[in-house]
């Protein structure tokens, strides 16, 4: 039972195809208010920054490896914020003269590599040595190493000297 036919195809099939042709995420994003758009943008920036986290068995140090192909080391920032949160942020930029500016530059036919700001936050354990955080950038991978604090030495019992009342005081001098 078909309701009507458009160009030889059932109306329902035409409507379904039109829905599939829409780029819904972009259409929905355009209708969001600016603070919500900023939130969506930041969540995408976090989701599009892949990171591996591993713990070294010998030392207990944490090693975070973040893929950052095409990012200049000067555009990367690593900081410890809000106590024990490691924040990695930066920006991936298009090469100079490679913009789609309508001039003599470049006209992109397909853009699949994401450009723009990126950010990742990682909560560090209480045992992390925040003064010993190191970062190294090589071959498009940022490696951040966070050493583990040595365990605190067990408290030794403190010996308290016991004084004997009245011993060593001359007799006859009372209070």
UniProtKB/Swiss-Prot annotation:
sHSP domain residues are 42-165
Q: Quote the subcellular location field of this record.
A: Cytoplasm
Q: Where is the composition biased (Basic and acidic residues)?
A: 146-161
This protein's record includes keyword Iron-sulfur: no
Question: Record's Gene Ontology CC terms?
Answer: cytoplasm
Gene Ontology MF term list? unfolded protein binding
Family annotation (CDD domains) = ACD_sHsps-like (cd06464)
Any GO BP: protein complex oligomerization
Q: Which keywords, in A-to-Z order, does the entry hold?
A: Cytoplasm, Stress response
Q: Where is this region: Disordered?
A: 145-175
Asked if Cytoplasm is a keyword of the record, the answer is yes
Q: Which InterPro entries match?
A: A-crystallin/Hsp20_dom, HSP20-like_chaperone, Small_HSP
What assembly does the database describe for this protein? May form oligomeric structures.
The similarity annotation says: Belongs to the small heat shock protein (HSP20) family.
Q: What is this protein called?
A: 19.0 kDa class II heat shock protein
Supply the gene name: HSP19.0
